[in-house]
Amino acid sequence: MKPLNIIFAGTPDFAARHLQALIDSEHNIIGVYSQPDRPAGRGKKLQASPVKSLAIEHNLPVFQPKSLRDEQAQAELANLNADIMVVVAYGLILPKVVLDTPKLGCINVHGSILPRWRGAAPIQRALWAGDTETGVTIMQMDIGLDTGDMLLKTRLPIEDNDTSASLYEKLALQGPDALIEALTGLAKGELTAEKQDESLANYAEKLSKEEAELDWSKSALELWREIRAFNPWPISHFTHQDASIKVRESAVSNLSSDAPAGTIISAGKQGIDIATGDGVLTLLNMQLPGKKPLSVGDILNSRGEWFTPGTLLNSKKLIGKEPAVKEAE
């Protein structure tokens, strides 16, 4: 197999892990593209991206155009005479002229099994939707949003204890191996591109802070998925005692209750049980404003009066007598 001359384009840590795999491979990296340095930290000093830092460490040429729509930037890229361009979480739009520049075009590492979740937040949306698996797709890029032909797919089961953070780590390990396998197949001419089935496509819109507010009228199952999907950002939260309280871990309880949604059913070291639109959700780990995340047991030691059974969340009043609960059938 003849090694490929590769342009790599990426910005965050997830992308840097794929660049490292290319550095360790037999292929030639002839240029690394990353977004311009951004102000970061308290001093707002310009900070290089993880991809740029890794490229400099290995003496690879770095390019940081503000846009690839610029003719000069396009000419500079064309002069590299690449066989292929690998794009991983780059963050800039690639116009058609750029997509068509490398001999084998541009390929992308996408964190889902296409066409299930296209877009910016496939990991989070897969969790929230209750998908049982996710994975990595290596695809040939076109002018659409994650609509290109699929070259290779890997699969990964979603476990009950997975959060977006844990799935991110798992896919960050799986992605580089999939990328190298796909490049080997392309270099040997052994990969067959597969068209995406448009009828199976969904758009994984970027998460917003507004979506992170817990709606107790939803089912316990949906809220449990939501809390996992929004960890580590933006973290699901609810308002109670005029405080925004973040929820980092929860579980679907085997209890049932006919109390209004948002009612505290019980509170103890094992968790705080909340009535929902369907079922009971147990809160296990929370974070009060300005404090570090703590187990519910520790929070009750200092704020036990906030979580009296029978209290309706986002209220300081009891709704009546302590609600009756029973084991779910």
Swiss-Prot record:
Q: Report residues binding (6S)-5,6,7,8-tetrahydrofolate.
A: 112-115
- Provide the disulphide bond pattern: none
- Molecular function per GO: methionyl-tRNA formyltransferase activity
Q: Which keywords are on file for this protein?
A: Protein biosynthesis, Transferase
SUPFAM superfamilies to which the protein is assigned, alphabetical: FMT C-terminal domain-like, Formyltransferase
InterPro entries tied to this protein: Fmt, Formyl_trans_C, Formyl_trans_C_sf, Formyl_transf_N, Formyl_transf_N_sf, Formyl_transferase-like_C_sf, GART_AS, Met-tRNA-FMT_C
Q: Name one GO cellular component term.
A: cytosol
Supply the EC number(s). 2.1.2.9
Catalyzed chemical reaction(s): L-methionyl-tRNA(fMet) + (6R)-10-formyltetrahydrofolate = N-formyl-L-methionyl-tRNA(fMet) + (6S)-5,6,7,8-tetrahydrofolate + H(+)
Q: Which Pfam families match?
A: Formyl_trans_C, Formyl_trans_N
Q: What is known about what this protein does?
A: Attaches a formyl group to the free amino group of methionyl-tRNA(fMet). The formyl group appears to play a dual role in the initiator identity of N-formylmethionyl-tRNA by promoting its recognition by IF2 and preventing the misappropriation of this tRNA by the elongation apparatus.
The record ties this protein, via PANTHER family, to: METHIONYL-TRNA FORMYLTRANSFERASE, METHIONYL-TRNA FORMYLTRANSFERASE, MITOCHONDRIAL
Q: Which family does it belong to?
A: Belongs to the Fmt family.
What name is this protein filed under? Methionyl-tRNA formyltransferase
Species of origin reads Shewanella sediminis (strain HAW-EB3)
